[in-house]
Amino acid sequence: MNILHIDASASDAATSHSRRLSAELVQKLKAANPGASVVYRDVAADRLPHVDMTIRQAWAPEGEKDASLTATATRSRAMIDELKAADVVVIGSPMYNFTVPSTLKAWIDHIAIAGQTFQYTASGAKGLLNGKAYLALSSGGVYSQGPFAPSEHLSTYLTAVLSFLGISDVEVVRAEGVAYGPEQDKAAMTSAQERIGALVAA
């Protein structure tokens, strides 16, 4: 099993709920699959440039771009190769202002490339990837249900992107309401950890 592990929290491992959950997911997946390999990418620590017109130019034929654009394409190709090689993708992400951190969005923009991870056909877009994904998510409030559910653009967005690219088998692990106090924080993490155990054991 090849695992691609992505972390996006701006907080460190000691304080980030999503980092702790994604690390536990990967640890349990490795324990259940001896010999599994892991490629790790921390998009918060190793920030990617936000996409502009250069990314489109970088994917142009070799003779039509300069050295800097070639470097942009090389970086993007490396991340796409990581994704294509993965049997399982684990993404750890907090909710920032109702959605993904901008650093994770930048990664998505670098790997969602027509002709590489999806293609346009006469009947619409078709994903070129496969495999399974686990989303280890955290939020200060509760967004999976209740009055703030319409504002949840974290799991819904990531699931939509992955499905668009062909990864339709997506499991979500949530630690919600972690800002509501120590008791809720502990309960949210316990619930998320129990779900991780159940998912990996299934």
What does each model-identified segment do?
Residues 1-93, 100-109, 113, 194-202:
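N-terminal beta1-alpha1-beta2 submodule of the flavodoxin-like/Rossmannoid cofactor-binding fold
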